[in-house]
């Protein structure tokens, strides 16, 4: 499965929840996550997508991830449809108990 297929599945999954998954490009800052995801319960996530086999974070992507986590923001690295399904399932649970 290609990364673009995973990305399209993420967009579809987020939109079925009523959220948005915007493409994130920053010309002056390499390593930023692929998508900023805003969910209806107020959660905002920085989401990096990689292909299932061999997809690894580049050094600048790891630095970005560490900075996002240090700032106590939400970050996810998703590599396949199953992980996206689990991630959206966890969101649904948080929404029910939150």
Model-flagged regions — what are they?
Residues 1-98:
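Catalytic phosphate/metal-binding cores of nucleic-acid and nucleotide-processing enzymes, i.e., regions
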């Amino acid at each position: 499965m290609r990364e673009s297929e995973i990305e399209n599945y993420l967009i579809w999954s987020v939109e079925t929840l009523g959220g948005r998954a915007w493409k994130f490009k920053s010309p002056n800052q390499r390593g930023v996550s692929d998508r900023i995801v805003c969910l209806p319960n107020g959660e905002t996530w920085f989401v990096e997508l990689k292909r299932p086999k061999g997809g690894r974070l580049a050094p600048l992507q790891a630095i970005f991830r560490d900075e996002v986590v240090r700032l106590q923001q939400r970050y996810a690295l998703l590599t396949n449809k199953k992980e996206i399904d689990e991630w959206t399932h966890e969101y649904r649970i948080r929404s029910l108990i939150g």
